[in-house]
Amino acid sequence: MISGDTILFALMLVTAINVARYVTALRSLIYIMREAHPLLYQQVDGRGFFTTHGNVTKQVRLYHYLKSREYHHHHDPVFTGKCDRVRELFILSGSLLVLTTVVAFML
């Protein structure tokens, strides 16, 4: 029989991998955003997005942009595809984080 620690370790590993995928996709989205949508790049502080002094309100602006799917009106299919990917990975990573936390408290 599989122990609870093994299940928790496997969940943590899957969660860590998906969070890494999300951060990588977010970095590439911000890189593409510089060319495809310069105004949004400036609004979300693209250059300082991943720095320690990054402005949280500007990061929340990108969250709301992706949440409300405003990117569907954009003309660049690469940009809209990347936005879809980042949105899906954010939902997946968030769900896995919640699930892993619940399982950790149950064990």
From Swiss-Prot:
Keywords: Cell inner membrane, Cell membrane, Membrane, Transmembrane, Transmembrane helix. The chain crosses the membrane at residues 6-25, 89-106. The keyword Cell membrane applies. GO terms for cellular component: plasma membrane. It is a multi-pass membrane protein. InterPro entries: Universal_stress_protein_B. It is found in: Cell inner membrane. Its main location: membrane. It comes from the Bacteria. Belongs to the universal stress protein B family. This is Universal stress protein B homolog. The lineage of its organism: Bacteria, Pseudomonadati, Pseudomonadota, Gammaproteobacteria, Vibrionales.
